[in-house]
Curated annotation (Swiss-Prot):
This is Protein TIFY 11c. Induction: By methyl jasmonate (MeJA), and drought and salt stresses. Induced by wounding. Residues 179-196 have a biased composition (Basic and acidic residues). The jas domain (153-177) is required for interaction with COI1. The gene is TIFY11C. A motif (Nuclear localization signal) lies at residues 155-162. The keyword Nucleus applies.
Amino acid sequence: MAGSSEQQLVANAAATTVAGNGSRFAVTCGLLRQYMKEHSGSNGGGGFLPAVTAMSLMTGGADAEEEAPEVRKTMELFPQQAGTLKDTQERKEITEKAQLTIFYGGSVVVFDDFPAEKAGELMKLAGSRDSTAAAAVSDAGAAAGQPCLPDMPIARKVSLQRFLEKRKNRIVVAEPLPESEKKEAESSKRAKKDDGGASWLQVNPTLSL
C-alpha cells in the first residue's frame, strides 16, 4: 500500500512539473501535505511521529545528592605546567639577586649577586649616616656663626676708640686757626721767601725771646 502510494505521488509530481502550472515550492508543499494525511490515516490518527521521552543525561545524580553532600569542584582552565612554574621561580631568584654598584670617595665598588634585602638595609644605613653627618655639620656651622660673648665688649671698645680718634682729627683739621697763629704763619712764609727757602735760617715761632 505504501509503495503504490509513493509511486502515485512521484507520478503526480512528474505530471505537474511537465505541465508547469505551478511553482516547484507549491507542488512540493502539496505533495508533503498529502503524504502526511495518508500516513496519519494509516496509523489510526495518532500521527507518524514517535512519543518523545526525556532522557536523563546525569545518571545517578539524585542518588549522589542523597548519599553525599554537594561538592563543587573548580575547573582549572589555565593549568600551570612544570616548565612555566620553574621559569617564574628562576626569574624571581634573578630579580632578588642583582648587581650592586657603589660610588664612594671617588672610587667605584661593584658586587655581583647582591641580595635585595641586604641592599635595602645598606640604603637605610647610608641614609641614617647622611642625616647624622648633616646634623653635625649644621651644628658646627651654627656654633661657628655665634660670636664669643666675652670678646664682644672688648671689640666694641676698640672700634669706638678708633672712631673717636678719627673724629677728633677731623674736628682739629676743620677748625679755623686763631688770628695770632695766622700772623705767625704768614711771617714765617715771608721769612722763607726772603731767605731763599733755607730751612736752617727759619725761626721757630714757639721760642720766646
